[in-house]
């Protein structure tokens, strides 16, 4: 299914409003397995809209028009589509009844013939009721092309799409199912290089890499009629990915909204283990992140933030074990970030020292970070710390 979105309204072309409807509809179409190939904007002009429809009807089999359904003279969308299809405009009974109720409850408002235009649909259309306004939308198929008319105001468009249009589209379309794999410790360019053969031959399912702060995600997507059918394809693609060059070693979790700290929080809760933290050079960011991830779960025993050490070594081995014992936690994490004197504001050279104390002993890791701003480096230091803890749990 090739779709084209046409935004109707001179105010879009003059920059008076931003076309947020295109973003919303593109996202929803993708979820339904509908490929949006074109975004078009056209002013409130019948001739230019007719020309736009002529082009769209030849290159797309779904044309979605947004805007131009109001009561004023420049609201021409339904009238122009009717002309293009060689049909008349007719009144929809439900939309007309809603208009009657609207004016009956507002005796001070004058009802004019223009108001009634909002209750019209193209003859032969399936009406799309508007839960958030008066202008009715519609959907009609002709010559192999489905035309959909939606209102311009985003609140009305979203309500009509969700409540009136989505159930109709879901009946006839394969949906897009996605799975997100999260990786830490490997860059996007390296990941893409390792997966070059998979990326080059992809059709359905597909995969797309996205670089995040300090990590990379892979979105796996497929069109299917059910979650079970989608899982068969996504499972195979995931297996192909993780067997490449030890990529399984970098994979840590699923999910668009997941993170390293959330993964640590989940594992702490699953194992019913507590952790105490002492940090230097991160400004308490570790403790703030874990507190947020755990919410009201009792697995963060507490912690402290210490100032500059004033020594060459950044190891906080004693501090990690002391805070573990002091707060009676299962784990004691100590993180120290030492900034080298030659660093600048936008080119920070640093060493990160990680220490994790447990009842059975102490493990440590040292990491060099360079070339980042101080704010970005703090985030990376925290990510390294959470990955260190994750690999221990």
UniProtKB/Swiss-Prot annotation:
PANTHER family: NICOTINAMIDE-NUCLEOTIDE AMIDOHYDROLASE PNCC, NMN AMIDOHYDROLASE-LIKE PROTEIN YFAY. It holds the Pfam family CinA_KH. The gene is cinA. It comes from Streptococcus suis (strain 05ZYH33). Gene3D superfamilies: 3.30.70.2860, CinA-like (3.90.950.20), MoaB/Mog-like domain (3.40.980.10). CDD domains: cinA (cd00885). Belongs to the CinA family. This is Putative competence-damage inducible protein.
């Amino acid at each position: 299914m090739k779709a084209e979105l046409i935004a109707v309204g001179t105010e879009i072309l003059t920059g008076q409003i931003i076309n947020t409807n295109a973003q919303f509809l593109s996202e929803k179409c993708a979820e339904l397995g509908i490929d949006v190939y074109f975004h078009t904007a056209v002013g409130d002009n019948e001739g230019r809209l007719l020309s736009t429809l002529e082009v769209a009807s030849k290159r797309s089999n779904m044309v979605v028009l947004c805007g131009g359904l109001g009561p004023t003279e420049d609201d021409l969308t339904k009238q122009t589509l009717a002309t293009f299809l060689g049909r008349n405009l007719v009144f929809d009974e439900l939309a007309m009844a809603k208009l009657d109720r609207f004016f009956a409850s507002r005796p001070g408002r004058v009802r004019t013939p223009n108001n009634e235009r909002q209750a019209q649909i193209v003859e032969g259309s399936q009406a799309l009721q508007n839960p958030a306004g008066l202008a009715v939308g519609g959907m009609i198929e002709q010559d192999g092309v489905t035309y959909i008319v939606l209102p311009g105001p985003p609140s009305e468009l979203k309500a009509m799409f969700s409540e009136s249009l989505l159930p109709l589209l879901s009946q006839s379309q394969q949906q897009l199912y996605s799975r997100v794999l999260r990786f830490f410790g490997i860059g996007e360019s390296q990941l893409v290089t390792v997966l070059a053969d998979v990326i080059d031959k992809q059709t359905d399912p597909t995969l797309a890499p996205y670089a995040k702060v300090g990590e990379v995600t892979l979105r796996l997507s497929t069109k299917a009629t059910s979650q079970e059918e989608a899982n068969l394809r996504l499972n195979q693609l995931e297996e192909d990915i993780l067997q490449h060059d030890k990529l399984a070693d970098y994979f840590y979790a699923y999910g668009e909204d997941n993170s390293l700290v959330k993964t640590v929080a989940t594992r702490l809760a699953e194992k019913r283990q507590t952790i105490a933290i002492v940090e230097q050079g991160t400004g308490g960011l570790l403790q703030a992140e874990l507190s947020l991830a755990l919410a009201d779960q009792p697995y963060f025993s507490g912690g402290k933030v210490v100032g500059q050490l004033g020594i060459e070594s950044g190891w906080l081995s004693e501090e990690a074990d002391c805070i573990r014992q002091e707060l009676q936690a299962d784990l004691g994490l100590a993180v120290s970030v030492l900034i080298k004197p030659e660093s600048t504001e936008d080119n920070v050279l640093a060493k990160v020292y990680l220490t994790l104390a447990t009842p059975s002993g102490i493990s440590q890791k040292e990491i060099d970070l360079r070339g980042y701003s101080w704010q970005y480096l703090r985030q990376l230091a925290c990510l390294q710390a959470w990955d260190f803890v994750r690999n221990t749990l």
